Swiss-Prot record:
Biological process annotations from GO: NAD biosynthetic process via the salvage pathway
Post-translational modification: Transiently phosphorylated on a His residue during the reaction cycle. Phosphorylation strongly increases the affinity for substrates and increases the rate of nicotinate D-ribonucleotide production. Dephosphorylation regenerates the low-affinity form of the enzyme, leading to product release.
Pfam families registered for this protein in UniProt: NAPRTase, NAPRTase_N
Biological or metabolic pathway of the protein: Cofactor biosynthesis; NAD(+) biosynthesis; nicotinate D-ribonucleotide from nicotinate: step 1/1
Gene3D superfamilies xrefs: nicotinate phosphoribosyltransferase
Protein name: Nicotinate phosphoribosyltransferase
One cellular-component annotation, GO: cytosol
CDD domains found in the cross-reference section: PncB_like
Enzymatic class: ligase
Gene behind the chain: pncB
InterPro entries named among the record's database cross-references: N/Namide_PRibTrfase, NAPRTase_N, Nic_PRibTrfase, Nic_PRibTrfase-Fam, Nicotinate_pribotase-like_C
Disulfide bonds: none
Length: 404
């Protein structure tokens, strides 16, 4: 096999913003913490045949480094401290941290281990690599124009439905969350550029490289791994979620204040999300479970705490498309501020193309298991049933179907 000498990932900033935001917090607070992350394909695709190409691309990532222009760009943002950015200039991917193999059944297996503040950077570019490699083989004739034309059709339908239903779009806000499962880097760039030029409700992108290139706000706070890791950082499992929330506020006391709610289910989250947290965080992000039920719970929680929901923001990001976002906007408009993060349905929405349902999740921290007990049973991640039972008991949650 002749391997392509052109790297797919060409910039350290070709990643989601929350990776850098979390990396800074880990660098400052947990710099000696070892972790393990693993790849999951939730679909039925056999991806093992691409292992050699993937390894080749991973090896080339060792050459990536923050450029002077990228350093200056990050320095201009309010999120980052000088000590972290100085260290980031020295950061290099270490391909030896990534073990790529093929199971007897032909599945792709990826095991990533090392210090958390280094391992944290692998997830997004690895998933983007896998997605682009597979689509190159499955859909070699698809073009960027196909993706942009499809987007234009979807936007037209969006406007038609909004007009037909008399929906005031003045408060609608969209963010691009499409890096991880994009068809290709070129498609993501073209789609976000199209939105920037022709969809006035776009308020940002999660991709730092695109944010820099297109002059868009970078968006993103923290991911499940932040809460998962604290299950083994906190001395008490029952207080681990509160410790994760508090530690984030110490790093970012006045910004990046959208909290992810579904690492251990929304109900367990709200029990920990007391008046002080609700006051200090700007809002909440939905990533699993029924979005309407979730939003109603969030609004009721704010009201119970005496907080006006119109001073807070809900971010919806679970498998959204334009029509789902419009339906949620119609339901919650004028009751709470809303933002919609659309990912795969923006950057891998091409007729005839099946997006991959792939993830990389934390499975260990400090040599011990961690778990994600999602509001969607199929999204639950576990490696150790005994630990899952301890987690359920600590947070008083019922039996959850596990996706191990």
């Amino acid at each position: 096999m002749t391997l392509d000498a052109t790297p797919i990932i060409k910039s350290l900033l070709d990643t989601d913003a929350y990776k850098l935001h979390m990396q800074q917090a880990v660098y400052h607070r947990y710099s000696h913490m070892p972790v393990v992350a693993e790849f999951r394909c939730r679909g039925d695709e056999l991806l093992g045949e691409y292992a050699t190409e993937l390894r080749h691309q991973v090896n080339m990532m060792a050459d990536l480094a923050l450029t002077d222009a990228e350093f200056n760009y990050l320095s201009s943002l309010p999120f980052f401290k000088a000590d972290y950015l100085d260290w980031l200039k020295t950061f290099r991917f270490n391909p030896q941290q990534v073990n790529i193999s093929v199971t007897n059944g032909g599945q792709l297996a990826i095991h990533i281990s090392g210090l958390w503040y280094e391992v944290i950077m692998w997830e997004v570019p690895l998933l983007a690599l896998i997605s682009e490699l597979i689509h190159r083989h499955h859909s070699p004739d698809n073009t960027v124009e196909n993706a942009v034309n499809q987007l234009r059709k979807l936007i037209k339908l969006f406007y038609q439905h909004a007009e037909n239903e008399g929906i005031d779009l003045s408060s609608f806000k969209l963010m691009d969350f499409g890096t991880r499962r994009r068809f290709s880097h070129r498609v993501q760039h073209a789609v976000v550029s199209e939105l920037q030029q022709h969809f006035p409700y776009l308020i940002g992108t999660s991709n730092y490289q695109l944010a820099q290139q297109l002059g868009l706000p970078p968006v993103g706070t923290q991911a499940h791994e932040w809460f998962q890791a604290h299950q083994q950082i906190s001395p008490d499992l029952a207080s681990s979620q509160r410790e994760a929330l508090q530690s984030w506020l110490k790093e970012y006391p006045n910004q990046l204040g959208i909290a992810l709610t579904d690492c251990i289910t929304m109900d367990a989250f709200l029990r920990d999300f007391d008046a002080q947290f609700a006051k200090n965080y700007q809002g909440l992000r939905h990533d699993s479970g029924d979005p309407v039920q979730w939003g109603e719970k969030a609004i009721a929680h704010y009201q119970k705490l005496g907080i006006d929901p119109m001073t807070k923001t809900l971010v919806f990001s679970d498998s959204l498309d334009f029509q789902k976002a419009l339906a949620l906007y119609r339901h919650f408009h004028n009751r709470i501020n809303l933002i919609f993060g659309i990912g795969t349905q923006l950057t891998c929405n091409i007729p005839g193309v099946k997006p991959l349902n792939i993830v990389i999740k934390l499975v260990e921290c400090n040599g011990k298991p961690v778990a994600k007990l999602s509001d969607s049973p199929g999204k639950t991640i576990c490696e150790d049933n005994e630990f899952v039972n301890r987690l359920r008991a600590a947070f008083d949650i019922p039996q959850v179907k596990q996706a191990c």
